[in-house]
Amino acid sequence: MSKLNIASLPKVSLHDHLDGGLRPQTIIELAAEIGHELPATNAKDLNQWFLDSCDSGSLERYLETFVHTCAVMQTKEGLIRVAREFALDLAADGVIYGEVRYAPEQHLEKGLTLEEVVEYVEEGLGQARAEVEAKGGYLVTGQLITAMRQNNNAQKIAELAVAYRDRGVVGFDYAGPEAGFSPSRHAEVFKWLNQQLMPVTLHAGEGDGKDSIRDALVDGRTLRLGHGVRIIEDIFVDAEDENQKAFGDVAAWVLERGVALELSPSSNLQTGALPDIDQPQMSDHPFDILYGLGFNVTVNTDNRLMSGTTLTRELELLTEAFGYDLDDLELFQLNAANAGFMDMDVRAEIIEIISDAFEAAAY
């Protein structure tokens, strides 16, 4: 299946960071306006710097690159432009529903309030949606308001998410370094979010293992697992007899309840999310094992700039590694659509668009 064909198919993006999806030229132009020094002065070299920095195999090193992207997202103009371009790039890649996650607390250095950050991001997303619609396209976006787990702002950010529930926000996210910063630190916040019926997804099973996933499920009350790739550490499959398999308690819980895994293949290889494999390749990613075992897998980009990727490219890489066909790709999109935090009527419309398009592509 060609890249062009995959690009033309409707897709759903659940795990995509706003501050990880900037255009290199935009970073350069916005940085010049505020006097922020960058490691490169042209778009090609800057793009390569991000790729090289993120191929270290360390989540901590990977996260350091966000110093430069966040630096140019501290003003009204910067946030609107970045959000607009972010969504337009999604639409250009065939995405019809995209959840846009970011941490408002990281965009306050120039005096913006948390509320202004959310409103300016929504303004940019709204501009993009209008442009796509004006050209006959279809794009729905939803903000995932993120609290940084290493900070102590979780309750404030949770209240922000709830306050903007009907103004562009669809859910709450919890990100940052996993090790040492368990969701149990903010268990009362997640209890409160649950009482508010606010959907929650937590980063878990990326920088830490199954205990982090357990915490996300128990104390975080998460509906989805941001990455969740290290659930594989709680599964045994005999290499010589695939019928011989065993699940630990955490893996069994996730499997039996259909908890969606927001897998981001290229990013997972970059950030050391497969710690037992030296220089892992896409064929080493446990995506196919998890899919074959019946886990609710979805395909995502995480940070398009840092991984030099798109959702089309992620699907293409998986197809090349594991031989997926059109039916597989459709199921991945339907999984994501069913796991999304959109309204029910929007979900039904998105599922219909996906089903119709994939049926047409089969002929």
Predicted features along the sequence, with ranges:
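Metal-cofactor-binding active-site regions of metalloenzymes
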Residues: 1-198, 206-224, 230-363
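Short HxH-centered metal-ligating active-site micro-motif
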Residues: 203
